[in-house]
Design a protein with these regions (language model features):
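Physicochemical signature of membrane-embedded alpha-helices that form the seven-helix bundle of GPCRs
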Residues: 11, 50-53, 82-85, 108, ...
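Interfacial loop-to-transmembrane junctions
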Residues: 94-121
Length: 136
């Protein structure tokens, strides 16, 4: 049996795994700090854990949806590359949120933000272009 959207499936599975890992760490940090809600009065580890989870949950769905919409007609190598950059950016962002903070954001966080935004721009433009081509 052939899978209809393999690039989307792999991207979604990796993002789901990252969400599970960050959710488990958030619960672990909550248990260690005995914090049911909130950030534990500024507990840096809890904030990092909950934001790494929340930020991924905020960004992954739309990227996955656009990848799924593009996949049936897209060049699989190009779409795989964009999906890989997105996943790499999200992993960098997670590591960046766990890095010790100084006066500026850690490199991983910067790479994660820029990589996520760039893949969003590419996916948005590609999706709109694909829709525009339907009308011609």
């Amino acid at each position: 049996m052939a899978m209809t959207l393999p690039i989307t499936a792999v991207t979604a599975a990796i993002c789901a795994l990252l969400l599970l890992i960050t959710a488990i760490d958030t619960v672990r940090q909550r248990m260690q700090s005995r914090t049911a809600f909130g950030d534990g009065n500024g507990n840096a580890r809890l904030i990092s854990a909950s934001r790494s989870h929340g930020n991924l949950a905020e960004h992954a769905p739309l990227a996955i949806i656009m990848i799924a919409l593009l996949e049936p007609s897209a060049d699989p190598r190009a779409l795989s590359a964009v999906a890989a950059v997105f996943v790499f950016a999200r992993i960098c962002h997670i590591f960046g949120l766990y890095a010790p903070m100084s006066t500026e954001p850690p490199l991983g966080r910067k790479i994660g933000v820029v990589g996520t935004w760039l893949t969003y721009v590419v996916l948005i433009a590609w999706t709109l272009y694909a829709v525009a081509r339907l009308g011609s």
